[in-house]
């Protein structure tokens, strides 16, 4: 029986797989994502999952980032609303897009109300 490429290089694959079990690596990846733009909590969890991190690690890392003030749903919502207003989208469309991201309705309406005063 011939050995597969993965069997012959198991130490390479094991070290590659193990980094996805490391919460510190997950935190670094999450911070890399947040350095580019704001993310909603659930969106960031899903982004980490899509990169290969477990549900548990993804959720705990994002929860800690939220506690540390590095991730904030209100900040994400305000940033999202501003970008959509610049694109010429109306309040109803913006609200629908935010609701599709499973963000708290109270935060959405509060941010829309605050930004409506500015525009």
Predicted regions and their residues:
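An alpha-helical, amphipathic repeat domain used for nucleic-acid recognition
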Residues: 1-119
